[in-house]
Amino acid sequence: MNKKNIIIIGAAGRDFHNFNTYYRNNEEYQVVAFTATQIPDIDGRQYPSELAGALYPEGIPIFSQDQLPELIKELQVDECVFAYSDISYEDVMRVGAIVNAAGANFKLLGPNSTMLKSNKPVISVCAVRTGTGKSQTSRKVIETLLEHDLKVIAVRHPMPYGDLNAQRVQRFATVEDLRKHNCTIEEMEEYEPHVARGNIVYAGVDYADILAEAEKDPDGCDVILWDGGNNDFSFFKPDLAITVLDPHRPGHELKYYPGEVCLRTTDVAIINKVDSATEESVQIVENNIKLASPNSTIIKAESKITVEHPERIAGKRVLVVEDGPTLTHGEMKLGAGTVAAQRLGAKEIIDPRPFAVGTLTETYNKYQHIENVLPAMGYGEQQLKDLEETINNADCEAVIIGTPIDLSRIISINKPCTRVHYDLDEIGNPNLVDILKDFIQEHKLVKKTACVTQTN
């Protein structure tokens, strides 16, 4: 039997999961390469044999996506599998055209081929775009379940930017664990808000192994929470699917892959940030939910912002630092830091571009929609150095940190700074407390010691 030669087109996340679940032990296929994009410096590596399995004793090479047409011809590729997220339909089909023009088939794997089934109840928190507020939603879900005396284990969508073997299964229980695993800023932004609240987070590369460890976590496990990445759908089959939408990008819920998959398969659709969006934009999003997911429960929510030192913003010339991926491939022009600056009466939000150095100059050149805000890029040591130098070069009176982590703990900032925190605050009913109360009863998770609370 002739095996089909496969290239998996990815960005160090969904691509590895698709391989592990669908291709690793499938003798009908030979995965000859991965390609990589979106994340700096991940091409030129190898998916190691220890993870690739017995059919791949040499491992699998990772190339830049730019080389795709040549690779298809040189490696006699039959099919290319698209496996990354937060990308417009136009760009997905452009990749498809490149693949077809080189002679290969173009393929997308769906949930039935890639989702793992847990022996614990699973709640997934996903989104239609990156930067919609998944993390604050996940925190709200966890905190609500904890009030019912339930043990919740969060499992985060992968961000394996380092040693893949060492990152096969990662467990984070303390901030020190983040240092132990040499986490990038992007990883810390997702893990730290959980562990700072005393919650356990798992992540890594092999999600079958991760799920098995999470289910038997030494601290106990009643519920698995899938904490999604970008706008990808869950790696685990959910018993309750929650999808977050952003009225600052109305219409994107029907235009970006695979966010529309999340929307069409969701049980609960949360329209976040309604306090900072126009009524017209909120209505567009609500109409699209009713069109694509008519049976889902719609919840509207504010992204409630609190500032540690508001006096450092009012009347000051400020530099705003925001979450990197939200601004870059998420295509946002602002975030919580910008909203805080506007609400608290900053004298001026400065343009950071004249002060940018190194890799940040490249980021601004690539993502030209980013203007009066600095993306916190920190995938590697050089980017961290460039971020620190850019902030310290800036002609401003204060720095607003709108990232989920405390940047001043990671880099040295030579100006007064203040952090912005943001939390999900639902408006009216139904809300997450109502939804989760039903979930707890349905899965017979009620404990005698639980205290039931009602918010809003």
Predicted segments with their positions:
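Phosphate-bearing ligand-interacting subdomains
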Residues: S49-N112, L384, N393-D406, I411
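Conserved glycine(s) of the Walker
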Residues: T132-G133
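Short, flexible coil/linker segments at domain boundaries that flank nucleotide/cofactor-interacting
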Residues: M1, K117-S118, I313-G315
